[in-house]
Amino acid sequence: MKFTIQNDILTKNLKKITRVLVKNISFPILENILIQVEDGTLSLTTTNLEIELISKIEIITKYIPGKTTISGRKILNICRTLSEKSKIKMQLKNKKMYISSENSNYILSTLSADTFPNHQNFDYISKFDISSNILKEMIEKTEFSMGKQDVRYYLNGMLLEKKDKFLRSVATDGYRLAISYTQLKKDINFFSIIIPNKAVMELLKLLNTQPQLLNILIGSNSIRIYTKNLIFTTQLIEGEYPDYKSVLFKEKKNPIITNSILLKKSLLRVAILAHEKFCGIEIKIENGKFKVLSDNQEEETAEDLFEIDYFGEKIEISINVYYLLDVINNIKSENIALFLNKSKSSIQIEAENNSSNAYVVMLLKR
């Protein structure tokens, strides 16, 4: 194997894929990058056995095909120290990788590419195309509600579901729920999968680029996403996701409409003196007044008030202030609508004139 590549191009692609590398004493090849040259393309692959990233780079100079694996951390550190526009030459000889650039030379150990674990064959049950900015927004609108280390392992991820021509992303930690949906241009086979928390966050980083069309394949236990120059594959969480539809309000009556900026500022003011552990605040709405109150373990109190256009039934609820702030930060609307269920056990929040994103937060006992 032999090829030449510009350093800034190689470094850019290495940075994208080395985030998933892990130190593994029992399986050291997981610390390596699979380097493969064939058909005028340089492929760089990393995996932690759950997430796999493949970056593809066109080679415009002469090359000799081949494949091997080298330390991901070492090659990235080498590239970082070299000048951006320098040319890097890499050649595999006698199971060693020879690297040269300008006046610098390196010899790295290799491990056989034959022992590198990767998803070469991917059988899918459903596939579709979607704009990267749409998928990115759906993830951003819901990811904060995912469980982190819940014993109910199926909560430590995001539900991605296609049903009735709609693609939905859903996340819940048992105390709050977030849902976002978009209509697909083409009808595709039904699927309902749970993407692990870490994979969701890694995907979000990869989608932080210029908008492009994504090709997505859904397998029985994994999902694969093709971007312009990168392939993202992750294992899925097995298990049945909770019935999120039973949490969403079937009837939404008497909405409380409030300016999102006014509410956010009010919440931030009283959050200063909220209980450090429970983070609870009280909200009282009556006669066009929206009052927010908090107290803490040191018997300190805070109160803030602003006017709204609501003259219905008096409302008194308690809620986690940071859960509410998370929702407001993800609703890009001048006004938001608050709905209270009959049992007064939860509240549903949406943008005033857009229900494509909805949030349900459990209320605290008063």
Swiss-Prot record:
Cellular localisation: Cytoplasm
Under the heading CDD domains, the entry gives:
beta_clamp (cd00140)
**UniProt KW tRNA processing keyword:** no
SUPFAM superfamilies cross-referenced by the UniProt entry: DNA clamp
Q: What does this protein's UniProt record list under function? A: Confers DNA tethering and processivity to DNA polymerases and other proteins. Acts as a clamp, forming a ring around DNA (a reaction catalyzed by the clamp-loading complex) which diffuses in an ATP-independent manner freely and bidirectionally along dsDNA. Initially characterized for its ability to contact the catalytic subunit of DNA polymerase III (Pol III), a complex, multichain enzyme responsible for most of the replicative synthesis in bacteria; Pol III exhibits 3'-5' exonuclease proofreading activity.
Q: Which domain of life is it from?
A: Bacteria
Q: Main site of residence?
A: cytoplasm
Name of protein: Beta sliding clamp
Describe, as the record does, how this protein assembles with itself and its partners: Forms a ring-shaped head-to-tail homodimer around DNA which binds and tethers DNA polymerases and other proteins to the DNA. The DNA replisome complex has a single clamp-loading complex (3 tau and 1 each of delta, delta', psi and chi subunits) which binds 3 Pol III cores (1 core on the leading strand and 2 on the lagging strand) each with a beta sliding clamp dimer. Additional proteins in the replisome are other copies of gamma, psi and chi, Ssb, DNA helicase and RNA primase.
Q: Which UniProt keywords apply?
A: Cytoplasm, DNA replication, DNA-binding, DNA-directed DNA polymerase, Nucleotidyltransferase, Transferase
What Gene3D superfamilies does its record include? 3.70.10.10, DNA Polymerase III, subunit A, domain 2
* Organism of origin: Buchnera aphidicola subsp. Schizaphis graminum (strain Sg)
Q: Which GO terms describe its molecular function?
A: 3'-5' exonuclease activity; DNA binding; DNA-directed DNA polymerase activity
Record keywords: Nucleotidyltransferase included? yes
Q: What family classification does the UniProt entry report for this protein?
A: Belongs to the beta sliding clamp family.
- Extract one GO BP annotation from the record: DNA strand elongation involved in DNA replication
Q: Give GO cellular component annotations, separated by semicolons.
A: cytoplasm; DNA polymerase III complex
